[in-house]
């Protein structure tokens, strides 16, 4: 882990932000674990602790005062490549050069993660976010170049090859990563089966969870009060489908063209603890969309404890402890929550002074550009605000299964997909976004106090991406086809595609403007 003084950033509006480790892996997964394997006694005691933590959480929710600043935050996972754009297994060296606590390891040695501090969305907040991200990434690029490494923002690196699975250096240093790999394989009892059927088909067995490291994302955070959490989560579940359709950027894995957002299905399979017999019995996967609308954040934590065995049963000495403000620490409950991979995850953070609840949106792939990332964030925050405050909630008119079906259809086919929408029926998702959702997102952003010129700046990007039906996935698929039509073999074409993608990414031109010639 990188240590050092927090990084400060002064925005174009003059606001000073300090980067600190609040929204990332340690907050959701707990502190560094102490073991790579666990005994039956540890697992038994951990289960007891989970139930105790859950009871404390239930009591605390009904009496506590939580932060209610409606702040937003962001995590961005990044790929590291060599100068030929093959994966570079040297995140430790890159992080040593960057020497900034805003940047941390991820499970794959060819990944790092950047954590952005919480900020207010109102006024110039979104532009401050854009400026800050660009500044931090430019700094990281400069430092990475010192060890001959490039940084790439995409959902799955197109140049990943099967040889990665046999490279013992793929896993980042740290007991928590080794423990997660061991626990998934032990729970499953056999090798990991990856079976993806899209434009092409890919099926193989992996001896570790290395395929999970291929999946890099943008994770958006929204701080909400206890009474607002359920409407916000339900709204986020509904818009998951148009979100993933708009942002799809992971069409290629292990030299195969698969789903537009292959990362969704790949992540599910890569850390699936269920052998086929358990899947056939209907046992829930750890990467989970959910199965019902909720009425409280407690519903989700209760499901976590009821349905999912512990992956990392790490017992904490602070289990019964509280902060100086009286917020229970609940370390086992929070660690367990970090090993249930919901696409919209609840976060309880006891904080240093005031506890807070957050919604962590995990649907978006990384990239393609900083402008696209902030436009995706604007769309998400605007839609959640609009839907959660509606007089007649949309989730009262949509079966949960329909929301889940929409999500999978959009992950598979991106902006080419069709969805079912209440009050409309079947509609192409691109048309839904342009005609209906962009105006609704604008209303939500207005309610949040976002400057009007910024609403237009970011939602124009969303509108044009949907209108042209060109996102990161469709551009990659089309550009690969063009290169192969010109005579390049698949491997050479993927290397050239990734070079051109990197060039476009650094231009910061939104992806709908990327050319195919």
Feature map (PLM): residue ranges:
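Acidic, Ala/Val/Gly-enriched low-complexity intrinsically disordered segments
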Residues: 2-5, 10
């Amino acid at each position: 882990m990188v240590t050092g003084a927090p990084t400060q950033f002064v925005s174009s509006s003059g606001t000073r932000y300090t980067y600190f480790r609040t929204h990332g892996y340690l907050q959701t997964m707990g502190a560094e674990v102490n073991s790579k394997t666990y005994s039956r006694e540890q697992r038994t005691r951990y289960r007891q602790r989970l139930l105790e933590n859950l009871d404390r959480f239930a009591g605390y929710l009904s009496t506590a005062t939580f932060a209610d600043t409606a702040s937003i935050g962001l995590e961005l996972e990044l790929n590291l490549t060599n100068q030929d754009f093959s994966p570079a297994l040297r995140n430790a060296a890159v992080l040593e050069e960057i020497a900034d606590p805003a940047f941390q390891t991820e499970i794959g040695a060819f990944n790092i993660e950047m954590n952005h501090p919480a900020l207010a969305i109102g006024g110039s907040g979104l532009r401050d976010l854009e400026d800050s991200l660009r500044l931090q990434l430019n700094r990281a690029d400069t430092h990475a170049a010192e060890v001959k490494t490039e940084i790439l923002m995409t959902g799955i690196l197109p140049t990943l090859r099967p040889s990665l699975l046999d490279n013992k250096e793929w896993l980042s240093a740290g007991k928590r990563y080794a423990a997660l790999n061991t626990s998934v394989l032990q729970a499953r009892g056999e090798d990991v089966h990856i079976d993806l059927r899209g434009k092409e088909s890919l099926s193989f067995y992996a001896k570790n969870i290395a395929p999970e490291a291929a999946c890099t994302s943008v994770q958006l955070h929204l701080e909400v009060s206890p009474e607002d959490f359920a409407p916000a989560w339900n709204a986020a579940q509904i818009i998951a489908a148009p979100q993933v359709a708009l942002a799809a950027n992971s069409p290629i894995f292990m030299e195969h063209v698969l789903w537009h957002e292959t990362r969704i299905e790949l992540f599910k399979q890569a850390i699936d603890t269920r052998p086929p017999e358990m899947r056939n019995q209907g046992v829930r996967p750890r990467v989970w969309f959910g199965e019902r609308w909720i009425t409280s954040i407690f519903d989700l934590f209760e499901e976590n404890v009821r349905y999912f065995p512990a992956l990392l049963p790490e017992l904490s000495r602070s289990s019964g402890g509280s902060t100086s403000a009286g917020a229970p620490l609940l370390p086992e409950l929070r660690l367990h929550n970090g090993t249930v991979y919901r696409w919209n995850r609840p976060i309880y953070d006891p904080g240093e002074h005031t506890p807070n609840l957050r919604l962590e949106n995990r649907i978006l792939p990384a990239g393609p550009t900083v402008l696209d990332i902030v436009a995706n964030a604007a769309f998400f925050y605007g839609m959640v605000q609009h839907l959660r405050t509606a007089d007649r909630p949309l989730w009262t008119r949509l079966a949960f299964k329909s929301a889940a079906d929409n999500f999978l259809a959009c992950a598979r086919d991106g902006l080419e997909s069709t969805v079912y929408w209440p009050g409309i029926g079947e509609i192409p998702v691109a048309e839904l976004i342009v005609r209906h959702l962009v105006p609704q997102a604008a209303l939500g952003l207005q309610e949040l106090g976002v400057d009007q010129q910024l609403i237009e700046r970011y939602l124009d990007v969303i509108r044009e991406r949907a209108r042209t039906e060109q996102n990161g996935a469709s551009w990659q698929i089309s550009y690969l086809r063009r290169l192969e039509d010109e005579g390049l073999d698949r491997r050479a074409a993927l290397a050239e595609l990734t070079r051109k993608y990197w060039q476009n990414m650094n231009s910061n031109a939104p992806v709908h403007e990327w050319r195919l010639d």
